[in-house]
Amino acid sequence: GETPALNAFPPSTVRAIAEVAERTGPGAQGQGDITAIFSVLVAGSDMEEPVADMVRGVLDGHIILSREISERGRYPAIDVLRSLSRCLPDAAKPDENRIIKDYRRTIALYEEIAPMLRANLYERGHDAAGDRSIERFPQLDNFVSEPNTGHIPQAFQHLQGLLDPVEAAEKT
């Protein structure tokens, strides 16, 4: 019996989580690989809860599902801004990374403006980037829930078209 420490978790919890995560990945020569998807359910969607925080620190990436997004009726209810892949920048092409960055920036700006929109306090015409995020958000939000086409280049081309229709038209 260990003395409880972090929110009643014993100190060995961090080590145990790291050991489980370290067992996945490439095995020794001739032993095969282990691919794993870990699922962590947090109480009250508190992502700062110790186990969720530890897992985020150990793994290469995480997909955060949002109760608020699911209540809006969008599935999968992936919170794109809070989800992360540390490997993605190296796995994606430079153009794809630029599109991803623009997508995340546009969604983040919309989420920043959304309370002002709901309170009828936002005035269009004063901030071009804000106006663009308001105009593009519905299509960008729907993009996440569209059926997978199975072709990554076409998905990025479609996303680029949603973000900047003029630039996308010039490329075709």
Predicted feature locations:
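P-loop NTPase catalytic core
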Residues: 1-172
